[in-house]
C-alpha cells in the first residue's frame, strides 16, 4: 500500500503533487543515519534536474512546481529507506537554493526510524570554505588512530548516562553511577537505574548528616565518590576521565545558554576521547542549536558508527544533560530540535521532577499526531520509555549491560603497563579485594574485613565516618564494577585469593580441629541455651559459624588455671537476632558432648581440638537394672518438679521449656535421656557440681547422681 501511494504521488502533475505532508511532532528528528539494504522493491531513480536558465534564478527557498515534485519524490524515497538516492535529490535542490531546513523534516524523521536497521552513511566530505566541517572531518580521521589508546572497558561506563564514569559514586546496592547523574535524580521516589531499589533507602547518612538532623535540619544524604575506583580510573584512563569532566561542564554551560562555551568544552573532550559516542551525539545537538546543520549531521553519523546497535528509544528530553542518556540509547529526536533547546535554554536551573514528567507526557510519541508515520508507532511497541527510569520505575531492560561495539573492534582494552594489582588491595588485610563492599563514605574493603571492623567500632576504618546505619541494616552488597574488574583483568590473582578464602572456610568448618569455644556457662544436650553476644571476638565467632554453614560451636565453663574446662557441649545455632549497635541474641540448643584435647586461640576467641563422647551401652541383666533405675529416678524427678511453687515452676518452663517425656529405651540416645539433662539444668546446683555429670559415660552413674541430689534437696525443703 505504501509503495502504491508513492508511485501515485510521483505520477501526479506538479500542481497537484506538492509537498503537503503534515508537520511531524517536534523533536522527531535524527542523530543517526541508515544506509543498510531494504527489502522493499526498488523505485525509479530520481530524474536529473534540468539546467537552469540564468534569468530563472530565484531567491533561496523559492518553490517551483518542478522543485515541489522533486521534493515529494525525495521524501518518498526517504520513506522507503532509500536514503542515498533521497540525499542526492536533496543535495541538487540545495545547490539550486530551492531547499530550506523545514523541508528536511521527512528525511530527519526517517533517519531517526531507520538507523537501527543497517549501517550508517559514509562520512560526508566537508564543504569548501567550511572551517567547522573541516575540523569535524579531521577529528574523524584522527579518531581511528587514537581509539586504541582510549578504548574503555564497558564496565567503566555509567549505567545511567552510558558515558565514562565521572566522579563514580557506589550505592549500597552495589551499582555505580556518575555523581552528577545521581544528583539529578535524588527525589524521594527515585530508584537505582539497574535494580530498582529506591535511592533514599540506598544513600545511608553519615554521622555528620545525622547530627545536622538533630539540630532540626534535613540535609540530603551526602554522595561520596568511590575513592579506589576514582583513583584507578584517573590513573588508567586520564584522557576519558578528563573528557567526562569536560562533558559535564559542557552540559552545565549548555543549560546556562552558553552554547559557544559548551561547544569549546566538547571540542576539547572529543580530542581526549575520540571514540566516545556520547561526545559526538551531544556535540551534534550543540551544532544544531547553533544552526550548523552539516556539522550536526556529521557528528550524528560518527556517533552512529561508534554505537550502531545501541539506539532504541525515541523520546524528547528537555535538556542536554538528559539528552546524553537519550543519545546512549539512540534517541535522535532530542538531538535535532533547536526550537526545543532554545526554549529550555532560557532557564537558569534544572526543572523540577514533576514539571519534567508533565513535559515528557506532552511530547511523548503517544501524545503526538498519528500522521507522523507508522515507524513511530512500531518503535513505541518495541522500546520502553526512558521516563520510567527517571520517574522512579525500574526498567527491566536497563538491568542488562549495554551492547558492546560491533565488528572486529575489541570489546575492552586496558593499559596493562600502568595497571598494578596493588591498586585493588584492601587497606585492612593488604590483600586483593575479595567480595568488595563500598561504604557510604566512599571507601572500599573486603566484606569480611569490614564486618570485623564493625564488630569493634561502628565507624569507617579510614575516615571515621559513622556507619551505624550500615551495621543496623546488615545488608552489604558487593560492588559490581570492582568485582567484574578484578575477574576480568586479574583472573589469576583472584583465583589465588579465592583459594585462600576457601581454605580458610574449610578449616573453620572442621568440627574436630580448631572448633570455636565460647567460654561462658554450662550447656547440656537437647537443652536450649540463649546467649547475649556483645564482645567483638564472639561476634566474629558467631558470624563465622553461620557463614561456614556448620552453625555449631562449643560451650565450656571457664577455668582459672586451664582457661576453660576439659569437657563441654556443642551448641547449634537455631536463630540470631541482631541489634542496631551490633549486639545479638543467639538462640542455640545443645547437641553433643566433647572432651578437649588441645587448646588454642584464633582471632581473639578460644578454639580446641576435641573428641566426642557417648554413653556406654549395657545389655542383659545390667540393661534390666538400668531400666528399673531409669523409671524410679524419672518418677522422683517429676514429683520434685511438681512440688515447686507456681512462680518458680513458671520461670523454669519459660526458660527451659517443659520436662521431656520418659524414653521407652533410655539407651536409644548416645547422650542419654533428654529429661536427665533437663533436670540437671534446672536443679539448684553450682556449675562446678554439674560438670562431672557432663563428663560421665555411664548412664547408670548419672541416674544415681541425680537421685542423690534430689534426695538431698527434698530433705532440705522439708
UniProtKB/Swiss-Prot annotation:
Q: Which UniProt keywords apply?
A: Metal-binding, Repeat, TPR repeat, Zinc, Zinc-finger
Query: Which parts of this protein are zinc fingers (RING-type)?
Result: 158-196, 426-464
Q: Name one Pfam family in it.
A: LON_substr_bdg
Instruction: Tell me where on the tree of life, at the top rank, the source sits.
Output: Eukaryota
A cellular component term, taken from the record's GO annotations: cytoplasm
Q: Where is the composition biased (Basic and acidic residues)?
A: 339-352
Taking every annotated instance into account, which residue ranges of this chain make up the domain Lon N-terminal?
505-714
- Name of the protein in question: LON peptidase N-terminal domain and RING finger protein 3
Which ranges are annotated Polar residues under compositional bias? 57-66
- InterPro entries recorded: Lon_prtase_N, Lon_prtase_N_sf, PUA-like_sf, TPR-like_helical_dom_sf, TPR_rpt, Znf_C3HC4_RING-type, Znf_RING, Znf_RING/FYVE/PHD
Segments of this protein annotated with the region Disordered: 1-69, 322-413
Instruction: Spans of TPR repeats, please give.
Output: 67-100, 243-276, 278-310
What GO molecular function annotation could you give as one example from this UniProt entry? Answer: ubiquitin protein ligase activity
Q: Which organism is it from?
A: Macaca fascicularis (Crab-eating macaque)
Amino acid at each position: 500500500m505504501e509503495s502504491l501511494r508513492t508511485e501515485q504521488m510521483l505520477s501526479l502533475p506538479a500542481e497537484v503533487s506538492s509537498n503537503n505532508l503534515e508537520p511531524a511532532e517536534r523533536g522527531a528528528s535524527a542523530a543517526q543515519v541508515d544506509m543498510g539494504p531494504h527489502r522493499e522493491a526498488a523505485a525509479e531513480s530520481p530524474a536529473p534536474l534540468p539546467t537552469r536558465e540564468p534569468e530563472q534564478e530565484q531567491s533561496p527557498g523559492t518553490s517551483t512546481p518542478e522543485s515541489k515534485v522533486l521534493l515529494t519524490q525525495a521524501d518518498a524515497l526517504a520513506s522507503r529507506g532509500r536514503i542515498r538516492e533521497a540525499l542526492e535529490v536533496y543535495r541538487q535542490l540545495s545547490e539550486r537554493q530551492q531547499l530550506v531546513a523545514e523541508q528536511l523534516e521527512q528525511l530527519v524523521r526517517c533517519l531517526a526510524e531507520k538507523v537501527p536497521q543497517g549501517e550508517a552513511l559514509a562520512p560526508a566530505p566537508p564543504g569548501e570554505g567550511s572551517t567547522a566541517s573541516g575540523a569535524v572531518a579531521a577529528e574523524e580521521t584522527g579518531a581511528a588512530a587514537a581509539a586504541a589508546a582510549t578504548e574503555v572497558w564497558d564496565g567503566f561506563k555509567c549505567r545511567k548516562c552510558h558515558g565514562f564514569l565521572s566522579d563514580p559514586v557506589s550505592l549500597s546496592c552495589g551499582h555505580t553511577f556518575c555523581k552528577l547523574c545521581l544528583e539529578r535524580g535524588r527525589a524521594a521516589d527515585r530508584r537505582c537505574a539497574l535494580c530498582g531499589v529506591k535511592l533514599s533507602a540506598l544513600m545511608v547518612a553519615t554521622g555528620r548528616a545525622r547530627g545536622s538532623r538533630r539540630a532540626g535540619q534535613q540535609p540530603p544524604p551526602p554522595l561520596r565518590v568511590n575513592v579506589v575506583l576514582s583513583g584507578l580510573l584517573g590513573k588508567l584512563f586520564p584522557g576519558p576521565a578528563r573528557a567526562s569532566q569536560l562533558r559535564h561542564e559542557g552540559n552545565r554551560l549548555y543549560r546556562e545558554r552558553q552554547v559557544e562555551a559548551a561547544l569549546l568544552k566538547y571540542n576539547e573532550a572529543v580530542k581526549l576521547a575520540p571514540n566516545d559516542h556520547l561526545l559526538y551525539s551531544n556535540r551534534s545537538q550543540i551544532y544544531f542549536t547553533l544552526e550548523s546543520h552539516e556539522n550536526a549531521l556529521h557528528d550524528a553519523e560518527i556517533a552512529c558508527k561508534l554505537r550502531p546497535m545501541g539506539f532504541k528509544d525515541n523520546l524528547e528530553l528537555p535538556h542536554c544533560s538528559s539528552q546524553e542518556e537519550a543519545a546512549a540509547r539512540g534517541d535522535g529526536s532530542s538531538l535535532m530540535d533547536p526550537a526545543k533547546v532554545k526554549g529550555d535554554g532560557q532557564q537558569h536551573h534544572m526543572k523540577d521532577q514533576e514539571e519534567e514528567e508533565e513535559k515528557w507526557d506532552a511530547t511523548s510519541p503517544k501524545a503526538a499526531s498519528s500522521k507522523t508515520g507508522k515507524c513511530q508507532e512500531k518503535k513505541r511497541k518495541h522500546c520502553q520509555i526512558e521516563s520510567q527510569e527517571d520517574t522512579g520505575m525500574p526498567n527491566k531492560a536497563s538491568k542488562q549491560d549495554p551492547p558492546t561495539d560491533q565488528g572486529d573492534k575489541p570489546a575492552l582494552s586496558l593499559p596493562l603497563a600502568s595497571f598494578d594489582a596493588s591498586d585493588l588491595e584492601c587497606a585492612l588485610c593488604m590483600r586483593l579485594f575479595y567480595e568488595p563492599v563500598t561504604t557510604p563514605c566512599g571507601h572500599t574493603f573486603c566484606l569480611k574485613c569490614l564486618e570485623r571492623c564493625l564488630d569493634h567500632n561502628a565507624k569507617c576504618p579510614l575516615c571515621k565516618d559513622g556507619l551505624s546505619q550500615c551495621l543496623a541494616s546488615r545488608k552489604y552488597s558487593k560492588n559490581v564494577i570492582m568485582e567484574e574488574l578484578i575477574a576480568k583483568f586479574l583472573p589469576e590473582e583472584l583465583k589465588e585469593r579465592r583459594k585462600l578464602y576457601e581454605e580458610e572456610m574449610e578449616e573453620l568448618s572442621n568440627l574436630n580441629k580448631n572448633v570455636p569455644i565460647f567460654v561462658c556457662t554450662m550447656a547440656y544436650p537437647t537443652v536450649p541455651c540463649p546467649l547475649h553476644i556483645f564482645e567483638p571476638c564472639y561476634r566474629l565467632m558467631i558470624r563465622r559459624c553461620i557463614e561456614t554453614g556448620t552453625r555449631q560451636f562449643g560451650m565450656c565453663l571457664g577455668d582459672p588455671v586451664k582457661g576453660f574446662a576439659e569437657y563441654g557441649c556443642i551448641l547449634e545455632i537455631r536463630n540470631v537476632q541482631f541489634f542496631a549497635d551490633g549486639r545479638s541474641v543467639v538462640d542455640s540448643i545443645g547437641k553433643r558432648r566433647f572432651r578437649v584435647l588441645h587448646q588454642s586461640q584464633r582471632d581473639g576467641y578460644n578454639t580446641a581440638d576435641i573428641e566426642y563422647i557417648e554413653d556406654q551401652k549395657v545389655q542383659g541383666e545390667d540393661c534390666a537394672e538400668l531400666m528399673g533405675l531409669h523409671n524410679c529416678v524419672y518418677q522422683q524427678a517429676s514429683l520434685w518438679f511438681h512440688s515447686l511453687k507456681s512462680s518458680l515452676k513458671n520461670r523454669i518452663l519459660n526458660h527451659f521449656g517443659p520436662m521431656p517425656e520418659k524414653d521407652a529405651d533410655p539407651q536409644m540416645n548416645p547422650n542419654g535421656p533428654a529429661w536427665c539433662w533437663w533436670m540437671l539444668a534446672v536443679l539448684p546446683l553450682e556449675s562446678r557440681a554439674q560438670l562431672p555429670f557432663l563428663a560421665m559415660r555411664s548412664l547408670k552413674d548419672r541416674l544415681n547422681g541425680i537421685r542423690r541430689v534430689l534426695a538431698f534437696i527434698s530433705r532440705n525443703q522439708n
